[in-house]
């Protein structure tokens, strides 16, 4: 069995889980609700206070789906109880960010500010004009939006200017040696 897939997903007290049509899972918790449809190759059951994912055979593809499905369900349960957060930093002279309505506006050295639409279900806050925090209950959506923000101006390896995740290390390169 898949090492991750064979572990049952525990359901906390304040979370309700519904399994519809055998492969559609609805998770409701204090922070909101998430619904996701999974592959019909797998069987998803609610046993006691746990969700168990079972697979019909040991084909490589099905084994991979087994672990993936269990991890996604676990992330749904964690999302509706704790939520997820990604933090980004802007580094560079004059680099600023601000939230205006449902848009994140980035001024990162281009001739114009870059406006990004904040997806529904996410909360974006900016501290000190240089620290961006993306919060939400859907791990995939939080990570995807944070990656989109970072891709506007990824940190460059010479001076380290750009947008990076908090705590991300950028490998510095030596500049060219110049004439002597």
UniProtKB/Swiss-Prot annotation:
Q: Give the CC-aspect GO terms.
A: cytosolic large ribosomal subunit
One Pfam family assigned to this protein is Ribosomal_L6
- SUPFAM superfamilies reported for this sequence: Ribosomal protein L6
Note the superkingdom of the native organism. Bacteria
Q: Under the GO molecular function aspect, what terms does this record hold?
A: rRNA binding; structural constituent of ribosome
Read off the InterPro entries from this record: Ribosomal_uL6-like (IPR000702), Ribosomal_uL6-like_a/b-dom_sf (IPR036789), Ribosomal_uL6_a/b-dom (IPR020040), Ribosomal_uL6_bac-type (IPR019906)
Per its UniProt record, what Gene3D superfamilies does this chain match?
Ribosomal protein L6, alpha-beta domain
Q: Biological process (GO) annotations? A: cytoplasmic translation
Keyword Ribosomal protein present in the record's keywords: the answer is yes
Q: Which UniProt keywords apply?
A: Ribonucleoprotein, Ribosomal protein, RNA-binding, rRNA-binding
Its subunit composition reads: Part of the 50S ribosomal subunit.
The entry's family comment says: Belongs to the universal ribosomal protein uL6 family.
**Purpose:** This protein binds to the 23S rRNA, and is important in its secondary structure. It is located near the subunit interface in the base of the L7/L12 stalk, and near the tRNA binding site of the peptidyltransferase center.
What is the name attached to this protein's record?
A: Large ribosomal subunit protein uL6
